[in-house]
Each structure stands twice: as structure tokens, then as C-alpha cells.
Amino acid sequence: MKYWNLKRTNQSTFEKVGPIPRSITNTFEKFRKELDPNGESEAIEEFRLSRHQTITSVKYIFLLLISPVLVNQASKFFDFGPCIDYLWNQEQPKIFINSSQEERAFAELQRFEEKIHFEVLLNPSGNISYEIIEKRVQLKARELGEYYANESANAVKNILSDILSIAVFILLMITGQRQISIVKSFLNEIIYGLSDTAKAFLIILFTDMFVGFHSPHGWEVIIEVILRHLGLPESRDFIFLFISTFPVILDTIFKYWIFRYLNQVSPSAVATYHNMNE
């Protein structure tokens, strides 16, 4: 494999922010390269370097995304899954592991009983005895018990598999410092290559999605899914506390980033953002 001069690649994207906006310095740098007699050979070298950077970045991003998912699914179905199922069914299986599961199961069973009662009221002349109703309720309760017992076992599998996936992701990050620097350079070149309007659009999209007026509803759904995935109780107090503080923290970090960094790197993008946001 050919070793490229990566120092030159990362220099433009990781240099400290100076008093002159980067767009102006890039314009002078482009003008200097056009007057350079060795500009053609440098352009070919930069193209090869850019292609190597793109291929390496795409491969490493794909590896970071796919490897933890594959490890998660493989460990869940082939390693932790059989062990958890065996231990879970050794004795009387525990149906519920938190109060939220009980509440959902009881509510679903109550709706089923009310549905049967409603059917009886609609058809009073039908041959539906109390024994038949009781049997249907018992079958439904048994079905709910099996469903939530499997959900409880799957929550334990999810916790173990997620821990292993996080460990694999951290290991890839630690052992891939060189690739990470290339990916950072690649992403920075993509971001700074966008027009000011595109940058402002992405900023508004991100802020409205995660810290905007309707974001609490999305955060509520996300937290409920995560808690249910891990088998944790879906505490409404915790969810409301999270969605009332975390978006505020994100909004503060975002505004500081605009003031401290983006305002010096691309002031025209900040001006476009303020004009579009008004």
C-alpha cells in the first residue's frame, strides 16, 4: 500500500482558527496555486491523495457502523441468547422485571375483558356463557404472560449484547487513530465544501429536530424505546426531566459552537443562518 503524506491532508482541516475567516484564506491559497508553475503536478498529487482519503474514510465509517451491529446480533442469537433462555426457563420463568411491563399487561388484559363484555352487550341472544368468557380471558392472560416473559429475557440479552457492541466500537476507535484523523479531514472537507445556504439549512434542520418546539415529543419516544429495549421502568418523571434539560444543554452547546468556531470560520454561513431563521 502506498503511504501518502497525511500531514498535508490534515493540516488544512485541523489548523487553529485564526483572525481571518477560512473562506478568505482559501481564496488566496487557490489563487497562489494557480500561479505556481508546479501547480499541475501538485493538483494530480492532491487528487490521488483525496481519492485515497475518500476510500479510506468510507471503509472505516462502514466498519464502525457494521461491526458493532454484526457483533450485537451474532452475540444475541448465538452466544447470550441460548444461555439466557436456558437459565430463564430453568425454574418458573419471571414474567415481569419492572412495573411498566405489569401496567402494560394489566391494561391490555383489561381492554380485552371490556371488548368481550361489549360483544356480549351487542349480542345478548348469543350463546356465550360465563365459562367461555373466563376461558378466553385465561388464554389471553397466558398469551400476555408468554409475551412479557420473552420481552424480559430479551431485555437481558439486549443489555449484554449492547455492552459487547460498545466495547467493540471503543476498540475500533482506539486502534484506528490514523483512520479517524483521515475521516475527520474527509468530513471537514465535505462540510466546508457546502454552500452557505446549504450549511444554514442543515443547521436549522438539526436545531429544529433536536432542540426545536416539537423536539420533546421525539425525545419522549426515543427515551421510551431505549428504556423498553433495556428492560428499565418507563418512569414518566425521569422522561420529563430528561426532555426538559437535555435539549437545553444541546442548544447551549450549539450556540457556543456558532459563536466560538463557526462565526470565525464561515461568517457568511452564520449570516445566512440568521437571515433564514428570522
Curated annotation (Swiss-Prot):
GO terms for molecular function: antiporter activity; proton transmembrane transporter activity. InterPro entries: CemA (IPR004282). The chain crosses the membrane at residues 61-81, 155-175, 203-223, 238-258. Keywords: Antiport, Chloroplast, Hydrogen ion transport, Ion transport, Membrane, Plastid, Plastid inner membrane, Potassium, Potassium transport, Transmembrane, Transmembrane helix, Transport. It is a multi-pass membrane protein. The keyword Zinc does not apply. Its main location: plastid. One of its GO terms (cellular component) is chloroplast inner membrane. It catalyses: K(+)(in) + H(+)(out) = K(+)(out) + H(+)(in). GO terms for biological process: potassium ion transport. It comes from the Eukaryota. It is found in: Plastid, Chloroplast inner membrane. Contributes to K(+)/H(+) antiport activity by supporting proton efflux to control proton extrusion and homeostasis in chloroplasts in a light-dependent manner to modulate photosynthesis. Prevents excessive induction of non-photochemical quenching (NPQ) under continuous-light conditions. Indirectly promotes efficient inorganic carbon uptake into chloroplasts. HAMAP family: CemA_PxcA. Belongs to the CemA family. This is Potassium/proton antiporter CemA.
